[in-house]
Design a protein with these regions (language model features):
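Thiol/selenol-based redox catalytic cores and closely related redox-interacting motifs
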Residues: 31-110
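Local sequence-structure signature of Cys/Sec-based thiol-disulfide redox active-site neighborhoods
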Residues: 1-22, 26-31
């Protein structure tokens, strides 16, 4: 399993703690240095939808006024933007074989 995470994110720390407690092996990837690939983002978008992939509480989301742009943004434009800036991506993202989970929900992680 790959876990795209940010070390200053409380939700990410909860996900890491949960996985460690369950003895799940995972590769930790700093989402700010290595954002998810376009392929992963497209797959996540099919599960969650475009708007749910954005970290709406992030500073850069507000600075870039993404909320205003989402109305006219295509899925490809969103994927390009998210793949270029990991701080815009909702986290953590867990990628395991055929499943992608965005955010941390204990029920989804079980």
């Amino acid at each position: 399993m790959k876990l795209y995470s940010y070390n200053k994110c409380g939700t990410c720390r909860k996900a890491i703690q949960f996985l460690e407690n369950k003895k799940v092996k995972f590769e930790l990837i700093d989402i700010t240095e290595t954002p998810p690939t376009k392929q992963i983002l497209k797959a996540a978008m099919k599960v969650k939808g475009m708007k749910k992939l954005f970290n709406t509480s992030g500073v850069q989301y507000r600075e870039l006024k993404i909320k205003d742009k989402l109305q006219t943004m295509t899925e490809n434009q969103a994927v390009d933007l998210l793949a270029s800036n990991g701080r815009l991506v909702k986290r953590p993202i867990a990628v395991d074989k055929n499943k992608i989970t965005v955010g941390f929900d204990i029920e989804e992680y079980k």
